[in-house]
Design a protein with these regions (language model features):
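Extracytoplasmic beta-strand-rich oligomerization domains located immediately C-terminal to a leader/signal peptide
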Residues: 2-74
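Short beta-strand-initiation
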Residues: 20-21, 49-51, 79, 88, ...
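Sterically constrained small-residue positions within well-ordered secondary structures
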Residues: 26, 47, 84, 114, ...
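A short, polar/proline- and glycine-enriched secondary-structure boundary/capping micro-motif
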Residues: 45-47, 73-82, 134-135, 145-148
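Generic detection of short hydrophobic beta-strand segments and adjacent strand-loop junctions
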Residues: 56, 82-84, 135-139
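Structured surface patches comprising rigid loops and adjacent beta-strands/short helices at the edges
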Residues: 82-95
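Short linear sequence signals and composition-biased patches located at protein termini or domain-edge surfaces
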Residues: 92-162
């Protein structure tokens, strides 16, 4: 998880309809995050990108990581899943922006069109029997929004159900 968070990059994902793009970083209140990361190792030198789309979410008291084999999605693009942790009561992701504001949703829905870039990703996870554990990752210095929200990017439907 740490490697994914520290290798976050500003690359949106094109969907199969060619009109919708998923933002480089998506967070909702259902304990869900989806992002594009760099540094996907390729020791067999397959013809593919070194960028990868990954997600984390809570499913049936399990922390699950999803990942796609291709960055841009066709009609048949289904993620593969890995169970990372069991006996998880709750998962929450937040973005702390460069102005110090905490966001439960990302990208933020602002009427003015002005937005700060993400500075950190916060994970709050409640695990039996340890209780609440919080982890904060500083995101790479990447200009995500550049002070402007891009109207072409959407939260869309970022992940297929398990």
């Amino acid at each position: 998880m740490q490697r994914d968070m520290l290798q976050l990059t500003n690359r949106s994902v094109r969907t199969s309809d060619d009109f919708t793009q998923l933002a480089p970083l998506l967070i909702n209140t259902d304990g869900f995050i989806e992002m594009t990361r760099v540094g996907w190792r390729n020791p067999l030198r397959h013809r593919r990108s070194e960028m990868q789309r990954v997600s984390y979410r809570l499913d049936d008291e399990k922390l699950v990581r999803g990942y796609w084999h291709t960055l841009d999605r066709g009609y048949d693009a289904e993620p593969a899943f890995q169970i990372l942790l069991e006996e998880v009561e709750q998962v929450e992701f937040y973005v702390l922006d460069t102005q110090g504001e905490e966001h439960k949703f990302w990208p933020p829905q602002l009427q003015s069109g002005q937005a700060a870039d993400p500075a950190a990703i916060i994970l709050r996870i409640e695990i039996v029997p340890f209780g609440v554990v919080e982890r904060i990752w500083q995101v790479p210095n990447v200009n995500f929004l550049g002070g402007q929200l891009n109207s072409n990017l959407t939260g869309g439907q970022p992940n297929a159900p398990l």
